[in-house]
Swiss-Prot record:
Its main location: virion. The chain crosses the membrane at residues 486-506. It is a single-pass type I membrane protein. N-glycosylated by a pentasaccharide comprising glucose, glucuronic acid and a terminal 5-N-formyl-legionaminic acid residue. It is found in: Virion membrane. Keywords: Glycoprotein, Membrane, Signal, Transmembrane, Transmembrane helix, Virion. Glycans are attached at N213. Residues 507-518 are cytoplasmic. One of its GO terms (cellular component) is membrane. It comes from Halorubrum pleomorphic virus 1. This is Envelope protein. It comes from the Viruses.
Amino acid sequence: MSVNRSSIKSLLMVFMIVSSSLLAPVGGAAADEFRTPAASDTSPEAGECSNLDDFIMFLSVGRINADSCSRQAYVDAAVQDMKDSDANQTKVDIYSAAAGVKGGSETWAAPYDNYLNDTESIAWMKAESAIAQSYSEGESKTEAKVAAKAAIADYYATKQKNLIEQWNFANAQMFTLREQARMEDGISRNYVEPAYRNVEKTNSPDYSLAYSNTTVEKSLVDGTTVNTTGVSMDVTVQHTTVSDVATVSSGPVRAGKYNNQYNEWKATYYSWSVEPASPSQDTLYAVHFQPYADRWQRIVDMNGALQSEADNFVNATWDDYDTGQINASDVLSANTAMSEYGVRSGSESEGLWRSTAALSMMGYDTPNLNNSGMMTVEYKNVQHTGLLMAKNAPNGSWQVNTTYNTSNIDGPVFMATTEGTKLDFADGEEFTIVGMTAKDGTAVNSTQTTKYRYKTANTTELLEVQNQLIELRQEIEDREPEAGGFFGSGSTDTMLVGLLALAGVLLLAQSNNRGGRR
């Protein structure tokens, strides 16, 4: 097929003339109109161009439709779609994680609340043991009261520490989710934030809200202090910032400034909230402040009530002990003897030995005790069979063929016998364990005393990991490439003009060469 080379040459010349006119500098109002499309501009959406749109962009060397039809426009559109998709997925992830925080808090709360119901009896056992030990060591009435109150307070302080750890953990999770949302493009900076209600304001106040994770020092019932997380609500009204902090014991807090004056704003913050990830979801309230404050106050009230009971108990028993009518171990109830002074064998459950102590102290007949195993102790040349009980046995155990002196043992030492009686060992007296048997009658050489270690949760390492994750995510966000303009720089325009001119020269040269062979 023959090609009209003259036509091709003419079209090329027209194209170059048009291109050069489009690339030539334009001044005045015409330049502004050329560079800034009017509001009625009907350019195609970025990355969505027809063949005609692409052709117009090509003829104009990117001066027309470049924002929509260039390769970079398609890249920009794809990147934006990915960002939108990433943001939507992140919303789902954050919402799901917050739901997990809420569910975990509720799962923790049920057994914790139930356990608080039983703490009074356990704390009272601690008080009885402290009083008995104080009496046995010859301390004064006042010292016995102090010891009892300290035992109660130490016990409840542990419960406060556990509550604080849960509070710290839940709030650290929410702050982590908040930072994640704020670092993600396409997500509202307030997607995760403390929720507020009961707003008081005057006119249309100019205000701004900010939230931060702060450290607050809390006093425990035993007089010690610990650091805990505080959720700081920072309200700026008329260039004045007022900060109020929600803590483990505060419950909802009023934050802001309101005195019924011009431009003021104040509200009650009561929970962490997360916006819905989709239209089908509701706002999620993950960590409410009030339940933590209720638990804190409950611990304080229980501690206070038992402190008063300790005073009354010492007042009621001191005179009898001081006059020799009762021994130190007589202040121990059966439950305290079972839980605090019982022993267990390495091959048997603690429940077996505790029940043995309880049955003996309660006066049950010998078969019940004999079926549970026995210890044989020689005291003042007389052997007694039953269960030896003490608050602090030497090295935490009793050994067969070992002689003990009560002066070397802290607290009272006594024996629950198979006859249903209680045998007290006087201070400074010696006794020897001559034998021990297990429940099945086999001989054993040693047995341990009952010990309790009240543990507090430790979330420090977890919080450190979360902080590291926040920093890592920020680094990743900072390194994400931003899409740039392809036709926007002068150097790029110059390069394109050069390429077009070179293409024209080559085509003209090729045409001339072919023309010479005609």
